[in-house]
Regions:
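Active-site pre-lysine segment of PLP-dependent enzymes
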Residues: 129, 136, 145-158, 170-194, ...
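Conserved glycine-rich beta-strand-loop-beta hairpin in the small C-terminal domain of fold type I
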Residues: 265, 269, 283-291, 300-312, ...
Length: 371
């Protein structure tokens, strides 16, 4: 009987394909796990100490919906120094996922079109559907670059928003300054909201990070500390954009998440002064290790940032390949979790080097084992 209570919108989305892979692998014993979407290192001690101190100091009640003033002020000063936009306002969100939910609810009406680049972060398509948006995919295969003319061709009079993610999950692709500028200028020309998911901005290995907000003062930026400071469980993000949009997101946060976790915001304040350059360099070296080990057997595009590689399977579908990998005690994610194609696999190199070496050995062995 309770099945009848489920809303229609919930039938538009499916459980995450990543969760399905984890369920499939539940009986694996000590798998070589290259599926992880979070850093392998622990939260820095200075952040833990700040969190514990905030709890001891009684920072355990609600904060202001928009976030604590010291954290907002510190981020706002950095944003102002980078962009020099008079109307760019910051607020603190309950994670970047919470921010995505807020911005889509604040901007999308039923039937509005949302442009998403394929491959895409798994959450984008589902959240857009939940708010009644119509997905319009722009393919970036084979090298995952942004062809702005394809975006222009995809725009209609119903286009409301473009979701952009660089460095990208799942491809690791980092958009060039030229691509980023062209996309930002197109959004401005067409009066379309451009949402830039910058959660991996710290992890750029071959070129500097460039935000579309540098070229379009109305870009809405979603960022956070989950990946850069290994705080995925803390649920702390931040957003900056035009005040008119930010105020609507704050209003919606008041009636949904209420606020970001209060003591975690004080930990975030400490995190902003925490040097993570050694971790970024470590991940650059891990990227290089995996690229060197796999280059003879796999086509490697992207992988200039984040901590992922999106590899074309040497045989079969991504699903077939991952099924065989699990039989060989290797846990990876099929590409159709992130794409309308099933031709690739996603691996994460957020792991200790001996595990990466074992994973690369299995991947190379599987490449020669055509089904």
């Amino acid at each position: 009987m309770s099945e009848e209570w489920i809303s229609d919108r919930m039938h538009l989305i499916d459980a995450s394909g990543i969760r399905k892979v984890f369920d499939l692998a539940a009986n694996m014993k000590n798998p070589i796990n290259l599926s992880i979407g979070q850093p392998h290192f622990d939260t820095p001690e200075v952040i833990k100490d700040a969190l514990c101190q905030a709890v001891r100091d009684g920072k355990n009640a609600y904060s202001q919906t928009q976030g604590i003033a010291p954290l907002i002020e510190k981020i706002q000063s950095r944003v102002d120094a980078e962009y020099h936009h008079d109307d760019r306002q910051v607020f603190i969100s309950s994670g970047t996922s919470g921010a995505l939910m807020l911005v889509l609810n604040a901007l999308i009406n039923p039937g509005d079109e949302v442009i998403v680049f394929d491959p895409f972060f798994v959450m984008y398509s589902h959240l857009a559907k939940v708010v009644g948006g119509k997905l319009v995919f722009v393919e970036t295969y084979p090298d995952f670059s942004i062809d702005v003319e394809k975006v222009r061709d995809a725009i209609t009079d119903r286009t409301k928003l473009i979701l952009f993610n660089s460095p990208s999950n799942p491809t690791g692709y980092v958009a060039s300054e030229a691509e980023t500028r062209a996309l930002a200028e197109l959004a401005a020309e067409k009066n379309i909201a451009l949402v830039s998911d910058e959660i991996y901005r710290a992890f750029c290995y071959d070129q500097p990070f460039v935000s579309p907000a540098a070229f379009n003062e109305n870009v809405i930026v979603i960022d956070g500390l989950s990946k850069s400071h290994s705080m995925t469980g803390h649920r702390l993000g931040f957003v900056h954009g035009p005040q008119s949009v930010i105020q609507q997101m704050i209003k919606l946060q008041q009636y949904t998440f209420v606020c970001a976790p209060h003591p975690v915001q004080w930990a975030g304040l400490a995190a902003l002064d925490c040097d993570i350059s050694d971790r970024v360099e470590e991940y650059r070296q891990k990227r290089n290790l995996m690229r060197d080990r796999l280059a003879d057997k796999y086509e490697i595009s992207g992988a200039q940032g984040a901590f992922y590689m999106f590899l074309k399977t040497p045989w079969g579908t991504g699903t077939d390949f991952c099924t065989e990998a699990i039989k060989n005690n290797l846990l990876i994610i099929p590409g159709n979790v992130f794409s309308n194609r099933d031709t690739h696999i996603r691996i994460s190199y957020a792991q200790e080097n001996p595990i990466l070496e074992q994973g690369a050995e299995i991947l190379n062995r599987l490449a020669d084992h055509k089904m």
